Amino acid sequence: MSNKQNIESEVSWVKSKGAFVHPSLEFSVIPDAGSCVLANNDINENTVLLKLPPNILINKRTCSRYSFRDKLTSFQFLSWLISEDVHSNLEISPYYTKALPQGFSFHPVTLTSDHPLWSILPDEVRNSLLERKNVMAFDYEQVKKFVSVDQPTFQWGWLCVNTRCLYYDTGSKNTEDHLTLAPIFEYFNHSPEAQTALINTRGTITIKSTRRIDKGEQIFLCYGPHGNDKLFTEYGFCLSNNPNISIQLDRFIEFDKWQQSFLQDHGYWNDYTCSLHGASFRTLVGVRTLLVSPSEKLNDASYDQTRRVLQYINGFSDGSRDRQDVEDYLKKVLQELLCEAEECKEKVKGISDGSYVFICAEQLWKDRIMCCQYLMEHSFE
């Protein structure tokens, strides 16, 4: 049975269990791009497109017969459940696992440290992937305490959950138990300009149109205001025109012990970013802290430069007196990042085999180039 046939069988099954699927939805498969949902007729604004009842959802509450489930996190339990269903046909939902991706070679979590792309990824992306790898390894060890499962199969199940889970109020006091998998819901792909809204209540999961959808349009959901770094590390894809680009500047900004102590004391240590909307407030505070000289005077709230930073932090000043110095400093930082990004983009192109993970890696560096160039021509505040 083809993947499209598996999806069609899954859609028929959820409808037989009480789900509402609008007749104008067409569940399709795009070659080399995966599944999607298309409109086979015009759809009006504020139309219910999908409504899933709780009896077809997959979470700790609906899969309660396993005695060890409460000894695992929902993520660990669902990862095992999905991977186990492949071998033993537990039928958590007929056709559900059959319609899942057969593999995740496109997902960067599967990259190894000797992969030629690994060392050319942006540092913050590589660190995020290492963190995800460590979480997956920890989850595998926890699951092995109760059941036997081989690592490749568990990794497949873990990535299925990682790329498909959503938050659904199960009624549990433990919010971690709200992690849920929803058959056919996952076929709505992500776009920051989605034509739909998700309505998530304890009774149902509902998707409604927020504008008119024309026949032939792909129907999207918005997973959140995520930049490509997040989309790549979590879901394994990037958008070529993502309005939510954010670049990390931490490794380009150095602080001495006085500056670090001041920023830690006031809750502004680390996580310095810029986006197409400008520099984050944290970043502007961090740079203003760097401008205080000598830095030992950061301990003296009456010192003029320190007082100005504190007034800026507390909203008593717009920081205009130091704005030009802040912009000059940030432009130097962005120039350094721009040079690195241009060099690394060319390195990725030079070793690319044309596969999707290389396309995404190049896009990550393109994001940085575009953001740096834009900000260097505009105000940061």
Curated annotation (Swiss-Prot):
Matches recorded under Pfam families: SET (PF00856)
SMART domains the UniProt entry points to: SET
Biological processes, Gene Ontology terms: meiotic cell cycle; methylation; positive regulation of transcription by RNA polymerase II; ribosome biogenesis
UniProt key word Thylakoid: no
UniProt keyword list: Cytoplasm, Meiosis, Methyltransferase, Nucleus, S-adenosyl-L-methionine, Transferase
InterPro entries in alphabetical order: SET_dom, SET_dom_sf, SET_MeTrfase, SETD3_SETD6_MTase
Binding-site positions, S-adenosyl-L-methionine: 223
Compartments in which it is found: Cytoplasm; Nucleus, Nucleolus
The keyword S-adenosyl-L-methionine appears for this protein: yes
Ranges for domain SET: 23-224
GO MF, one example: transcription coactivator activity
Entry's family note: Belongs to the class V-like SAM-binding methyltransferase superfamily. RKM2 family.
Main function: S-adenosyl-L-methionine-dependent protein-lysine N-methyltransferase that trimethylates 60S ribosomal protein L12 (rpl1201 and rpl1202) at 'Lys-4' and may dimethylate L12 also at 'Lys-40' and 'Lys-41'. Overexpression causes a severe growth defect. Has a role in meiosis.
Protein name stated in the entry: Ribosomal lysine N-methyltransferase set11
Gene that specifies this protein: set11
